[in-house]
From Swiss-Prot:
Assigned protein family: Belongs to the Vgb family.
Active site: 256
An example molecular function term from Gene Ontology annotations: carbon-oxygen lyase activity
Assembly and interaction partners: Monomer.
Enzyme class: lyase
Chain's gene name: vgb
Key word Lyase present: yes
Organism in which the protein naturally occurs: Mycobacterium sp. (strain JLS)
This protein's name: Virginiamycin B lyase
UniProt keyword annotations, A-Z: Antibiotic resistance, Lyase, Magnesium, Metal-binding
Residues reported in the UniProt entry to bind Mg(2+): 254, 271
Amino acid sequence: MSLIREIAGGPYALAAGPDGAMWVTLVHDGAIARVGADGAVDRFPVADGSRPSLISAGPDGALWFTRNGDDRIGRLTTAGELTEFPLSEGSAPFGICAGADGALWFTEMGSGGIGRITVDGETSGWASVGGTPSMITRGPDDAVWFTLNQGNAIGRLHPRDGVTMRELPTRGAGPVGITATHDDAIWFTEILADKLGRIPLDGALQEIDLPGKPHAVVADPSGGVWVSLWGADRLARVSADGDIETFDLPPGSEPHGLAFGPDGGLWVALESGFVLRMPD
């Protein structure tokens, strides 16, 4: 099954909700959209200039998202109830993920920090890492892993171990997207170097050439990863062995966020104004 829905406002990132719908940030309109299993679209205004960016399902059954434009974390229930939690001015939160500890972890691009927020809304600044931290994911080791877009490194944070950094071999790589796969590895994109990286928990860092300005990356439940090629209007599927298959999108699509839906289908946010479910 394939599905495409026109949604104005700059669809940027997606997450599957516990209600069987896909939830989408609209970065230009300051809103969140819900795409139901039947394809119906509902919009939930957030605030002008809020720039909702990344979104994650929380352990409390709500959707949590970063408000990069007005320094807040947002929480939206599946019933449409919105709550906001202010952060320090200029923090510019961006990436967010659910951690192993039952809290949400997020990056602060502006202040260079990694933050934590409980489902009750208690926020804390956990680490100052610099380097413009971008996206963040829970790793197979229950740490959170994140990209340092201007620091040219991958970071790992665990409350027990603190912060460790892995410098990238390619200078000026501009890492952005990051995800964990079931084979105990961390995958990440290098948008400025046209590469995809992989860090096995028990091995050395690897890089694969992947032209097209790779942006977001998501683990494929059947193995390997999917990558949005923002600069080429394509998607790429990369196997665990490094084999690459690409899929063309309409010109000017600007593919960004990727997420698998409750039905097992791959969904893509196209900043040009569409949300696409890829054919099975």
